[in-house]
Each structure stands twice: as C-alpha cells, then as structure tokens.
Design a protein with these regions (language model features):
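N-terminal low-complexity, acidic/polar interaction/targeting segments
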Residues: 1-213
Length: 213
C-alpha cells in the first residue's frame, strides 16, 4: 500500500471523538472498547496503522469536516478484547465524502497543508514562546508551586503552532478553528491573542493576591 503522504486523495477510516482535537506531531492515547472500533483497529493494524480523528460536538451533534490522521505507534491488547493504543498525529485532512458507515465510518479525504509563509515567522514564534513562559511564571506564583514548561517545545513555527494549540485544554471549538487554519502566521497570531488574554488575566489575579497578603 502506498503511504498516505504520497496520495492526494484516499479512503480513510474515521473515528469521531467528543470534543477531542488532534494536531500533527502530538500524541493521543485511546482505549478502544466499542466493537466497531475494535474491528477498525484490527483492520488498520494489518495495513498502514492509520485512521482519522474528527472532533464531534455532542451539543450540536455535529462532526467536523477537518481532522488529523493518527498513526498507531503502540497497541496493547487486553484480555477482554479492549485495546489500549498510543497514536501520533500526522497530516491534516478534509472529508470530501462518506464512503460507508458500517461496520465503521470510512471517508474519502484530501490532505491539507499550510500555505507557504509570506514572512519570516520566527519572531512571531518567539513572541508566542515568551507569552507561554509568562503564563507559566504567573501560574506558578498564583498556585505557590513550581510549574515547568515541557522540554519538547518545538523550535519551528508551524510545529510550535500545533504544539501550543494542543495545550488549549477545555477549548475544543477554539482548537478546531486553529486546526482548520491553513496559514501558520494566522494560527500563531490567534494563539498570541489567546495567550495575551490569559497572561493579563493571571497578572491581574497576581496583583490582587499580593494586595490581599
């Protein structure tokens, strides 16, 4: 079978997950217990070990059209036929059409990438990284405990933009918007806005805490 990166359009097994957004280069652990998804995993483990993760909004009962391909890098089979798997995000895709729905959803997808940058994105990336450090520093002060940034912060702007987006816990809709952007600069700029707002909020709380001491 040809690798997915060499095919512009292909069929891909799809796994909608409630309020979960996967980004390229980011890990996603899953526990597989539904029969249809056990069938899916058994099938893909005999081929290229890849499937598509789509964010499902349970409030609107809507599945996003843009998702991220996941590759199974580890699979543990349990005695009761459940599976514990670790996956890693690969490239993003857009669903063009549903091929079939049983025993599990399969879609016809096209791969999508960011447009070539029109500017040097390194300064924007450095701004985002500094904002991250500010947020961590202020969070540490508020919680009276040491919080360290993970050591795996990417240096390349595109990878950094995915890395930051993956840590926006509890904001699946915002994460989905960032996933769908095909402009690294626009993604980093939006993350700058989010982190600036977070930093300012934390700074205000820190001042209040110091005042009340």
């Amino acid at each position: 079978m040809a690798s997915s990166s060499s095919v512009a359009v292909r069929e891909l097994p799809l796994f909608p997950l409630p309020e979960v957004v996967l980004f390229p280069g980011r890990p996603l652990p899953l526990q597989i217990f539904e029969f249809r998804y056990r069938i899916m995993m058994n099938t893909i483990m005999e081929s290229d070990r890849r499937f598509g993760v789509l964010m499902w909004d349970p409030n609107q009962n809507k599945v996003s059209a843009v998702g991220c391909c996941a590759e199974v890098i580890h699979c543990q089979r349990l005695p009761d036929d459940r599976m514990k798997i670790m996956t890693l995000g690969q490239q993003r895709f857009r669903v063009l059409d549903a091929v079939r729905e049983k025993p599990y959803l399969v879609g016809l997808v096209e791969w999508i990438e960011d447009a070539p940058p029109q500017q040097d994105l390194r300064p924007l990336g450095k701004d985002v990284e500094q904002l991250l450090r500010d947020v961590v520093r202020l969070s540490s002060k508020l919680m009276d405990q040491s919080i360290d940034l993970p050591e795996d912060i990417p240096s390349l702007p595109t990878e950094l933009s995915y890395w930051v987006a993956s840590y926006l816990y509890g904001a699946a809709t915002e994460q989905q918007t960032l996933l769908e952007l095909q402009d690294t600069a626009a993604r980093l700029e939006r993350e700058t806005e989010i982190l600036t707002s977070t930093r300012n909020h934390l700074a205000a709380r820190t001042v209040l805490k110091d005042t009340l001491k």
